């Protein structure tokens, strides 16, 4: 027998750290175990808080939408007729989660700074502008506008109106969509702030430590195994990101999370050039606090490969230069790739598994981990300690996938 605690969290990305913070604030003894594997999702994030944009496919989700339209065109089908099941408009329950989570950030940024001294660089942005290049994209924006409630303000802009907001945008566009209330943080500092604030409240961490499996007895998860060591826990929270499914499988559980590679390009610092975050069918573009321009992100099902490829980087750069031509003269500071935890319906997997005690999911946020982290952390903490949920968790439970809990028989 090794360590023992009330709650073990496996995985130290922004979700894991945020859950640790919420539990530690509730004075729950918590131990977070993290291997810091290459390619965790936080490293693939732009730090854009784009709740409505992501929920309707106008954030980096529009890249998926463009791919679908291109595939239809190649197949001889009308690219304007995008099937409902294949568009980027996600369920209203998820949009509501993202909007509510985003609304927590202004107070949360101050709270974290006061608690642990880390500034997450929360910045009220000029919104999210989606540049419209052709009629297919214009028609998609019209569908999005019709699908949104009045509380989610989307303004369709003429080219002239767009250039007044963003003078550096290409003259190739035929219009744009503006989503207000979309902001930015530094993703790495946000994760670090959650971690340090959790420590202030009493959470413990084990770094560079790989959990090799879950220990299950009958219908209960007893704790985690670290090689020959066993750490007992009343509850294990699986926040292992792209590795969530692999960890769950060690206890005979099926949690359908898979890795999705996202390649990122970061430019050298520029004087303030962009007033808003930009999204196009080729990339998204966000100028960070210190002037660097972040260009992302590919969406690739390539397993756990975190390689940066010429094709991926070239595609992102071409998309960025098309949108903002002056970027062709800017040097590249860094390129990298991260693995985001994807699910087939693009919704996170949260909460308990029916028939299994002592186990909770906290994964699958895919492109929205940063913006969703505050509220996901609250929901998972509430699930752990038996509090009432801030919002319904049912749309995010694993049982929506059908056969979920008993992929193989657990040990008796």
State where each predicted segment sits.
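Glycine-rich FAD pyrophosphate-binding loop
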Residues: 24-45
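Dinucleotide-binding Rossmann-like beta1-alpha1 core, especially the glycine-rich loop
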Residues: 48-161, 320-321
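Helical element adjacent to the flavin cofactor pocket in flavoenzyme catalytic cores
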Residues: 176-235, 243
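Active-site substrate-recognition segment that forms the wall
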Residues: 18-25, 47-54, 61-87, 117-122, ...
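N-terminal Rossmann-like FAD-binding beta1-loop-alpha1 element of flavoenzymes
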Residues: 5-31
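Helix-loop-beta segment of a Rossmann-like dinucleotide-binding subdomain
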Residues: 90-91, 118-134, 140-201, 298-302, ...
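C-terminal catalytic lobe of FAD-dependent flavoproteins
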Residues: 324-412
């Amino acid at each position: 027998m090794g360590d023992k605690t009330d709650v073990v969290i496996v995985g130290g990305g922004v979700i894991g750290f945020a859950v640790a913070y919420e539990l530690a604030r509730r004075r729950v003894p918590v131990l977070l175990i993290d291997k810091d594997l290459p390619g965790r999702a936080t490293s693939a994030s732009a730090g854009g808080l784009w709740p409505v944009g992501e929920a309707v496919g106008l954030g980096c989700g529009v890249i998926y939408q463009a791919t679908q339209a291109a595939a239809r065109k190649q197949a001889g089908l009308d690219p304007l007729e995008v099937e409902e099941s294949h568009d980027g408009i996600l369920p209203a329950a998820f949009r509501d989660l993202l909007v509510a989570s985003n609304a927590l950030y202004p107070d949360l940024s101050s709270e974290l700074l006061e608690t642990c001294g880390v500034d997450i660089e929360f910045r009220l942005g000029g919104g999210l502008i989606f540049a419209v290049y052709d009629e297919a994209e214009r028609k998609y924006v019209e569908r999005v506008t019709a699908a949104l409630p009045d509380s989610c303000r989307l303004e369709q802009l003429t080219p002239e109106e767009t250039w007044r907001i963003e003078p550096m945008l290409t003259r190739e566009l035929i219009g744009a969509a503006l989503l207000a209330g979309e902001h930015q943080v530094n993703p790495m500092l946000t994760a670090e702030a959650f971690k340090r604030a959790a420590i202030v409240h009493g959470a413990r961490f084990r770094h560079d430590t790989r959990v090799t499996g879950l220990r299950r007895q009958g219908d209960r998860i007893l704790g985690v195994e670290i090689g020959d060591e066993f750490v007992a826990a009343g509850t294990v929270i699986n926040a292992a990101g792209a590795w969530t499914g692999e960890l769950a499988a060690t206890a005979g559980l099926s949690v359908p999370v898979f890795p999705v590679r996202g390649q990122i390009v970061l430019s050298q610092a520029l004087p303030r050039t962009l007033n808003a975050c930009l999204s196009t069918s080729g990339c998204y573009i966000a100028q960070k606090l210190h002037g660097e321009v972040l260009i992302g992100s590919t969406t690739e099902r390539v397993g756990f490969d975190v390689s940066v490829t010429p094709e991926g980087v070239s595609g992102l750069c071409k998309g960025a230069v098309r949108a903002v031509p002056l970027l062709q003269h800017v040097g590249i500071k860094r390129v990298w790739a991260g693995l985001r935890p994807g699910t087939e319906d693009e919704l996170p997997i949260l909460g308990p598994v029916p028939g299994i005690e002592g186990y909770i999911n906290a994964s699958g946020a895919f492109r929205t981990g940063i913006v969703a982290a505050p509220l996901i952390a609250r929901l998972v903490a509430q699930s752990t300690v038996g509090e009432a949920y801030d919002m319904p968790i049912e749309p995010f439970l694993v049982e929506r996938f059908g056969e979920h809990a008993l992929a193989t028989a657990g040990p008796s």
